């Protein structure tokens, strides 16, 4: 007769966890040996795994070997020091240890009573971060506001939009939904458009305002004022503005002070999305980029991007938590308890879309305690310095140009097209990106700014050092030389750049 399954045996955990930590540590020691961008073809894994799950147990050694041989080749290595695509997704020893503890407890902290420590630690740690960022006191839990950990900035944007929507519907009536107008620039993350779709905002009432090179792709206050005036004249209700500190395409910074004043005059909900660049604002020399946050109703940043905290961990602060709670709260009988009914505790289920939630504050707490503010500031500054060095390398080669001035650790640049080039270098840079990524030596991503195909070089991986910056630049130079030598610049193909 088979032994009964003991899925959480302490000694088995001890033995296997040691093996798993060794496996992960070995992965990090050898991470530079892998192509940064996975080189597999779509559907590669289907032929490598059985058609059905096993009937009987297999050994951990066999599973780990399959990970080495079958899974790792299909991994794009976000933690590689040669990863420069999108924006970073940081990991660290502290963050990893926090994830381990969270997985060990495996609580589902939807309300206070479900695990008091999970709720209370989150409140405390978000207050710590608010003070590190020098946010106004209204964002602290001691007043009417407070902070909460969401999964992603997309969730943060959605919940504050829902809170704002319901606040205005309560004021103007449920039938006024068709009149509510949302404002953002064309550089705002696409998550805002999705949030509007989910919130039922009429598509024609999502104002996407043009931001171009004349403002370094920041939202122009005059454009916002004009759009609001036109909508008011048409009998519509301007109610929500999303500004960005560190846009996805170019790390542009919207002018918060001026936008905040416009929002205040028009009694709008002003939200600031600093998913990427918010982390830099713990450094005094970068704090001015969120000057004007005083007028914001809500603010978010992703600790999992550039703050050494493993994914997922998006931080959201709000000045009036009652707006979130009124929009998102539910009180089924099976969740009622004395502490909640007496309003003596925070129930974070009412600050988010799902009911269940992980103990995410543990890893953030571990990062803050094991590294401290000074080390975190140095970490940010080093990446910005490395990006500055890469920018100088670009400027030193007359074949390239920096497309927008660098603000943080993102460099936007392109290879200049030969004279009389038909598409202004679009295909040329498309091909350069494809060649660089196909080499497996580095991974970068792209955007399009004012019709120009632009390569984004985002410094932020925890293991990246100066040598990796220099090596990456050599890859660009070598591939550019090959491209320019092989054609007159009039026709460049790109086999798979559209999906990179």
From Swiss-Prot:
Chain positions found as N6-(pyridoxal phosphate)lysine: 305
Names of the cofactor(s): pyridoxal 5'-phosphate
EC number: 4.1.1.25
Summary of the tissues where the protein is detected: Mostly expressed in bulbs, and, to a lower extent, in stems, roots, leaves and flowers.
MF terms in GO: pyridoxal phosphate binding; tyrosine decarboxylase activity
Residue segments, region 2 X approximate tandem repeats: 65-176
Entry-linked CDD domains: DOPA_deC_like
Sequence repeats: 65-122, 125-176
GO biological process: alkaloid metabolic process; amino acid metabolic process; carboxylic acid metabolic process
InterPro entries according to UniProt: Aromatic_deC, PyrdxlP-dep_de-COase, PyrdxlP-dep_Trfase, PyrdxlP-dep_Trfase_major, PyrdxlP-dep_Trfase_small, Pyridoxal-P_BS
Annotated positions binding pyridoxal 5'-phosphate: 153-154, 248, 302
Similarity comment: Belongs to the group II decarboxylase family.
Protein name: Tyrosine decarboxylase 2
Organism: Narcissus pseudonarcissus (Daffodil)
């Amino acid at each position: 007769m088979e032994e009964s399954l003991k899925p959480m045996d302490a000694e088995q955990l001890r033995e296997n966890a040691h093996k798993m930590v060794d496996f992960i540590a070995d992965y990090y020691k050898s991470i530079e040996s892998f192509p940064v961008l996975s080189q597999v073809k779509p559907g590669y894994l289907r032929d490598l795994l059985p058609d059905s799950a096993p009937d009987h147990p297999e050994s951990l050694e066999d599973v780990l070997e399959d990970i080495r041989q079958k899974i790792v080749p299909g991994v794009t290595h976000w933690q590689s020091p040669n990863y420069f695509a999108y924006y970073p997704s940081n990991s660290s020893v502290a963050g990893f240890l926090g994830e381990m503890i969270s997985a060990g407890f495996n609580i589902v902290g939807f309300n206070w009573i479900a695990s008091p420590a999970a709720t209370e630690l989150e409140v405390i740690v978000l207050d710590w971060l608010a003070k590190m960022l020098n946010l106004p006191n209204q964002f602290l839990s001691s007043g009417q506001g407070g902070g909460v950990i969401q999964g992603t900035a997309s969730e943060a944007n959605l919940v504050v939009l829902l809170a704002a929507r319901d606040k205005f519907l309560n004021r103007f009536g449920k039938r006024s939904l068709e009149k509510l107008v949302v404002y953002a620039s064309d550089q705002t993350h696409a998550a805002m458009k999705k949030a509007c779709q989910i919130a039922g905002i009429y598509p024609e009432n999502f104002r996407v305002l043009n931001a171009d090179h004349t403002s370094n792709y920041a939202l122009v206050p005059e454009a916002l004022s004009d759009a609001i005036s036109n909508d008011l004249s048409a009998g519509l209700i301007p109610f929500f503005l999303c500004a960005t500190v560190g846009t996805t395409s170019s790390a542009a910074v919207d002018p918060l002070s001026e936008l905040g004043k416009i929002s205040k005059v028009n009694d709008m909900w002003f939200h600031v999305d600093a998913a990427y660049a918010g982390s830099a604002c713990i450094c005094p020399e970068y704090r001015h980029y969120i000057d004007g946050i005083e007028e914001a109703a809500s603010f978010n940043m992703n600790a999992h991007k550039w703050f050494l905290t493993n994914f997922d961990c998006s931080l959201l602060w709000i000045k009036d938590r009652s707006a979130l709670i009124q929009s998102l709260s539910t009180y089924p009988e099976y969740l009622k308890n004395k502490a909640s009914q007496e309003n003596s505790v925070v129930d974070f289920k009412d600050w988010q879309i799902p009911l269940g939630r992980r103990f995410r504050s543990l890893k953030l707490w571990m990062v803050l305690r094991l590294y401290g503010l000074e080390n975190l500031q140095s970490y940010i500054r080093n990446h910005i310095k490395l990006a500055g060095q890469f920018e100088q390398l670009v400027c030193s080669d007359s074949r390239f140009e920096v497309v927008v001035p660098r603000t943080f650790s993102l460099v936007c640049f392109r290879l200049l097209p030969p004279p009389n080039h038909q598409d202004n270098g679009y295909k040329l840079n498309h091909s350069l990106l494809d060649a660089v990524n196909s080499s497996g030596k580095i991974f970068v991503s792209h955007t399009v700014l004012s019709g120009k195909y632009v390569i984004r070089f985002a410094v932020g991986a925890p293991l990246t050092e100066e040598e990796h910056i220099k090596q990456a630049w050599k890859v660009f130079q070598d591939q550019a030389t090959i491209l320019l030598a092989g054609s007159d610049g009039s026709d460049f193909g790109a086999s798979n750049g559209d999906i990179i």
